[in-house]
Structures are given as C-alpha cells and as structure tokens.
Amino acid sequence: DAWGTAFWSEAYRSFDEITLPKTAQMFMNHHQILDYRRFAAGQTNDFLNEQALLIKKFARNQWVTTNYIPNYDEGHIGGSKQLDFQSYTRYMVYGDNEGIGRRGYRVGNPLRIALANDFFRPIQGTYGVMELQPGQVNWGSINPQPLPGAVRLWMWSVFAGGADFLCTYRYRQPLYGTEQYHYGIVGTDGVTVTPGGREYQQFMSEIRNLRTHYAPRDQKPEAYLKRRTAILFNHENSWSIDRQKQNRTWDTWAHIEKYYRTLKSFGAPVDFITEEKDFSQYPVLLVPAYQLADQLLVDRWIDYVKKGGHLIVTCRTAQKDRYGRLPEAPFGSLIDKLTGNEMEFYDLLLPETPGIVRMDDKPYSWNTWGEVLKPGKENRILATYQDEFYEGKPAATFRRLGKGTVTYVGVDTNDGTFEKEILKKLYGEFSIPVMDLPYGVTLEYRNGLGIVLNYSDRPYTFPLPAGAKAVVGEPTIPTAGVFVFTL
C-alpha cells in the first residue's frame, strides 16, 4: 500500500518477489525507488560503522573517519555514527568552466569549497578535508594547470569555513599506475617541490604565524552573527523530485544554490541542517523545495515562527508525504495554515517562451516552476505573474505569525536575480544588516580572524573594519588572493 503498487496492476505476494528497481526506466515505481535508496544509504552507513568498530577494536586510540565525496544527494553522508568526525574530498580544476572570467577554469567554482564546508561542519562540528587538489590532475576531461595562487586559495577556503585539518592527495606524483599524470606535493624525482607544493609550504608558514594572532574563543562580529541562516536539507526531497521533475529544466540543486549564492554575497554564515537540529538557534530558516513532509514537521515550522523565527519557504514544499504520496486533500494544502495561502494550481513553461514574474515593478524571467497562490487577508503580496492567463495572481507572499514571519516563494526564476532581490527585501524587513559582496568574493570569520577570499577575475578592495589589523595580504586582493585580518 505504501508503494501504491495497485497502480498499473502491480502486486507482490511476498517480499521475495521484490527486485532491485531499474532506476533508468522512466516509469519505474517512484515509491519503490525512494525506499530502495533509503535502504542502500542505510546499508552503506552500516558497512562504514562496521569498519569503524573493527578498526577501533584493534587500534583503540586511533581516530576513524571516511573520505566522503560531496555528492550531497547521496543519502549516506553523515549517517555513520561510529565515525569520530567527518571529512570530504574536493577537486577544483579538472576541465569544467564554472569559474569566473576567461581563465576562471584555472581557479574553479567560487562556492564549491564554501558549500562543502557549510554542509559538513554542522553534522558534528569537527570536520576536515582528506583530499585537496595539489595541482594538475589526470582524470578530468581536460586537465589544465591551476592558476598560480589557486592551490593556496583553496587551502585558505577550507580553513576559513572552520575545518580542523587538511590533507592532500598526493605527496609524490606516481611513477606508474592509473594516475601517473596526477601532480603531488613533490614531482617524479621525489625531491623537487611542485608549484602546488610551494603553495602548501606558504600556507603552512602563514598558519604558523597566525597562532600569535588568533583568539581561542570563536569571536565573531555581532552583525555577522545576526545574519546566521540555516538551509533545511534532506536528500530524499531531491530523490523524489528528480523522479518526477515535471519540467526538464528543473534542477533541485540549482534552485537551492540560487539562494545560497545570495546568502554568501550577504556575508552570512550558513549551515545546511537536517530535521534533527534545533531550528531556534537561527534567526532565519530557509526551506527550499522541501517536497516530503508531515504534520509534525509543519508544526515545528509554525512553532519556530511563533517564537520569533523568520521562515522562508519555496516552491514544491510539503506537496507529498514521506512515502512520496499525494495526500487525499487539496494539492499542497499541508502548509496552508503556515503560509496563509491556498494554491490554485502550478504551471510549467517552455524555456523558449518564458514567463515574467514582477516584484517592485521589476520583471524577472521564469519557466521551470510557478505556483499560483490564493493568499489570505493577512498576507502581503510580494510578487505577481505577468503575461499569462493568470496575470496579476500572486507568486510570493509574506505574513507575520506570532513573533516571527513566514515568506512563501512559489516560483523558481531563471538566473537567480529574483531570488537575490527577494532575500535583500526580506533581510531589510527583518532589520538584519547585509553586505553586497560581488560573486567570487567570500567572507568568513573564525578564531577572531576575518578571512576574505577572491575567486573573481579582477582585484577586489575589502573595506577593513575600524580597529582591524591586516595579518596576511592586503585589503586590495588580487585574483586567487587572500586577505586575513584580526578583529
């Protein structure tokens, strides 16, 4: 019954008849695949736990972790409780073109390490990087040299996010085997330090010098802490949506990253959290495309808001139960009491003929997903649709509930500009001060230090706070440069 196998006359007489689902088949049972992926993630975690316990049996004083690849939709990440802490692997330059500018492919995606930090740090607090790219690699589609300074930039990015350790793969370039063309800290002679190795040396020297400046207590500016934001994440939502996208242009992670990118431009500390965490420690809680939900979770959201939290919920949230089934109720109605809205319907447009959503008399293009809302009297309309048969109908709303607020954004736009503008509008409403850092520049604080990282293709001049003192670099930061200051 949980899988709805009566649909298309599927029936199982016993568990022995159940086979592994063929996920490549377009119409394979969605609910069965969801449960199978839960099972597979659980088995992976059990196996990691078994290995950890076995190692600890014979090496009781040995720390045990594993080297996760940050594929965030894989359900086993963070689920092995026998690990002492979390670690991940991160490569930045391997032939993609996600950097900024003509040579951005030599530096890498500006938020790739930042997002990994913000994802892994909240799991246990203690975490690090087990593999960080030391230079040129062998396994990409095209394997260019990193830009001089990029390896050091990546190391500083790991440190800035709060990591406790950093390792690389590998020390020496291998003389044989599959990865002969993979750089190490030293070259094939085992003696000559590579360009990346020299940047490791520079970083280690800088960290040693910082020990005379750091604060043992994690001092951070008050304005920075006011911006603290959590993104509620459950990989199962991606599993469910990706089986039934309804629009080929839908991308769950791209939807989340539109908001994440804006938050980092605000200079906001961000945590990706699960439902196990306490929502109340965050002034703002973002809930993007959280499709699988139940009444217990919705009640927690309501409680968070009534006690003073600012909740931002986006499209496709709470439309299915935990099995991926549609409730026998009006579509999407589980959160009606939370948002103060009813949903009339949702629409999906061809990318060749996008629609327009308008906020503060400015137009924004969309096509992937749009919910037409019917707001209650207490709701304020933030954005409306244009140029469709539902022109003038609400796309986003805002309401006050108890001591807090609820914002519902029912549309996913094309380039993220709308998402940025609505967050700017909301943080102003919340009286939370934000920065306006250009894409490619990030700011983090740890141990009484401010750390500014420049992944962009041009120099950036950071306004040094009053009373701050530069300890690494200068306020005008070149491409692949770093600036560190004390508070």
Each model region followed by its residue ranges:
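Carbohydrate-binding surfaces of carbohydrate-active enzymes
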Residues: 14-21, 33, 37-40, 49, ...
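Active-site neighborhood of glycoside hydrolase catalytic domains
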Residues: 1-66, 70-82, 266-267
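Glycine-enriched alpha-helix->loop->beta-strand junction motifs that scaffold or abut catalytic
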Residues: 82-86, 162
